[in-house]
Regions:
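Thiamine diphosphate
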Residues: 1-156
């Protein structure tokens, strides 16, 4: 929102549906100021990062991450409609280009709901390394120690 308010012509926000659920109230600000923000929602119908973490650390027991485990997510096009923001839905990679092109032509806010698989493995991911919890800057798949040091902006 800040980048758009500063005058950027097209701002693209790529967000998962779970994260979007925590911030959808910002659509009111986007609409009120008619900000040219394109919101691309990667929709896997749940909290996929949490689901992957639970599956990894809790012997496959999954709770509160999707409809099957007690959490319902609204239709993203309907959410956009409530805020009077135009929206579209890409059901497959074959239709994605068409909808991205349509979104980018809009001078007003636009929400693109991209339907994704519900079983995607999320990477990079925080995990254990050498028997200890790896720090946030060192996620799986791991870089070599040399490459990690080279990519860091601060010394390790």
């Amino acid at each position: 929102i800040g980048v758009a308010k500063a005058g950027a012509k097209n701002v693209i926000c790529i967000v998962g549906d779970g994260s979007f659920m925590s911030n959808m109230q910002e659509l009111a600000v986007i609409k009120e100021h008619n900000l040219p923000i394109k919101i691309i929602v990667l929709n896997n119908k749940g909290y996929l990062s949490i689901k992957n973490t639970q599956g990894k650390f809790y012997d496959g027991r999954i709770y509160g991450v999707n409809k099957a485990t007690g959490v319902w997510f609204p239709d993203m096009e309907e959410v956009a409609s409530v805020f009077k923001i135009k929206a579209g839905r890409a059901w497959s990679i074959k239709t994605l280009d068409k909808y991205v092109e349509m979104a980018m032509k809009q001078i007003a806010p636009y929400l693109l709901d991209c339907v994704c698989t519900e079983d995607q493995i999320i990477m990079p991911a925080q995990t254990f390394k050498k028997g200890q919890q790896a720090p946030l800057h060192d996620m799986f798949p791991f870089l070599s120690d040399e490459e990690l040091q080279q990519e860091m902006v601060v010394s390790l």
